[in-house]
């Protein structure tokens, strides 16, 4: 089960919804492919991600596409063993302003059955804010 929480602006009440995420290892176990379905802001949501560890660069790399837009988000970052997390940094084109914006994603392993993803990006004032949180719980 995936619990989604989204914030439109700092201090505003969040929007919550649920969905399903299916992860599978592909191409000889080199890549994790994620398929996500649910509702977001009252609309059907579908997204696909690919996460991999680049042995040459020594970082994780992630790509993401969904039905809320037409762009592809690319992010990369290191694993932190002390916090059991990956901090991914990347850019995405804002469809409203047609300018590239910085985004940050923190992906944490809570335990064997729970993972947490937090997405940060620019708010209306241009300052970084927490935009989304996804809590993934393994189906038993």
What are these regions (language model features)?
Residues 1-140:
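Hydrophobic small-molecule pocket/channel-lining residues, especially in calycin-type beta-barrels
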